[in-house]
C-alpha cells in the first residue's frame, strides 16, 4: 500500500476500521468479506479503490493538507503509469511495479482484512476479530495472526502480540473471544 496511499490516508482508514469493525456501512475492510466467493481474488485488491472512495467521497481526510497529499500521490501515480506506457515501458512497469503491488496487496488484504475478521458476523469487541495461534504464521505475518490482540490493545507493538496473547489467553477464552482456529 505504501506505493498507493499516504500515511494520513491509511491512518484515517485504519482508525475508521477500528471504530466500526464489521459494520458493513462504515468499516472499509468489510468489502473483501462481503464479496462473492468466486470474486474474492479480485476483491483482495479492493483497498485500491474502496479506500479512496471512502476517503474522498465520505470526507475521511483529517485536514486539507492530508487530502491534498493523497491527491498529489494519485496524480503522480497515474502520470507515472501513463508515462511508462507512452514511452514503451509498460511491460517494465508491469513486471517491476504492478505484479509485485498486486501480489503484496492481495497477501496483506488476506492477512489483515479477510482472515482475522471472518466470518464478519459480530461487531462485539471480543468477537469481531480472532487470533490464529501458530509460530510459523507469527513469523510470516509479523504477529498479525494475533490480530485480536491488535484490536483489543492497539498500542501493543506487533512484536509483542504473541506474548500478550499467551498472557491473556485464559481471560480472552473466558470472555468468549475467538482465540483458536476452531472458533
What residue ranges belong to the model's regions?
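Short hydrophobic "helix-edge" motifs at membrane interfaces and signal-peptide entry regions
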Residues: 90, 106-108, 139-141
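Non-catalytic, topology-defining segments of multipass membrane proteins
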Residues: 1-99, 155-183
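Histidine-centered catalytic micro-motifs
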Residues: 10-23, 113-118, 140-156
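Membrane-embedded alpha-helical segments that form the functional core of polytopic membrane enzymes
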Residues: 1-8, 103, 133-144
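Short, surface-exposed loop/helix-turn segments at secondary-structure junctions
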Residues: 123-129
Amino acid at each position: 500500500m505504501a506505493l498507493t496511499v499516504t500515511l494520513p490516508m491509511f491512518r484515517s482508514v485504519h482508525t475508521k476500521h477500528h471504530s466500526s469493525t464489521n459494520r458493513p456501512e462504515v468499516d472499509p475492510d468489510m468489502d473483501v468479506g462481503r464479496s462473492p466467493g468466486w470474486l474474492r481474488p479480485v476483491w483482495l485488491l479492493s483497498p485500491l479503490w474502496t479506500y479512496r472512495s471512502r476517503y474522498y467521497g465520505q470526507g475521511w481526510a483529517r485536514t486539507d493538507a492530508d487530502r491534498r497529499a493523497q491527491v498529489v500521490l494519485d496524480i503522480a501515480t497515474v502520470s507515472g503509469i501513463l508515462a511508462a506506457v507512452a514511452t514503451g515501458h509498460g511491460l517494465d512497469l508491469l513486471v517491476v511495479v504492478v505484479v509485485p503491488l498486486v501480489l503484496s496487496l492481495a497477501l496483506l488484504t488476506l492477512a489483515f482484512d479477510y482472515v482475522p475478521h471472518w466470518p464478519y458476523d459480530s461487531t462485539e469487541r471480543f468477537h469481531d476479530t480472532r487470533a490464529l495461534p501458530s509460530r510459523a504464521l507469527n513469523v510470516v505475518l509479523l504477529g498479525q495472526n494475533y490480530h485480536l490482540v491488535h484490536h483489543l490493545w492497539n498500542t501493543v507493538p506487533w512484536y509483542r502480540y504473541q506474548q500478550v496473547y499467551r498472557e491473556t489467553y485464559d481471560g480472552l477464552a473466558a470472555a468468549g473471544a475467538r482465540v483458536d482456529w476452531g472458533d
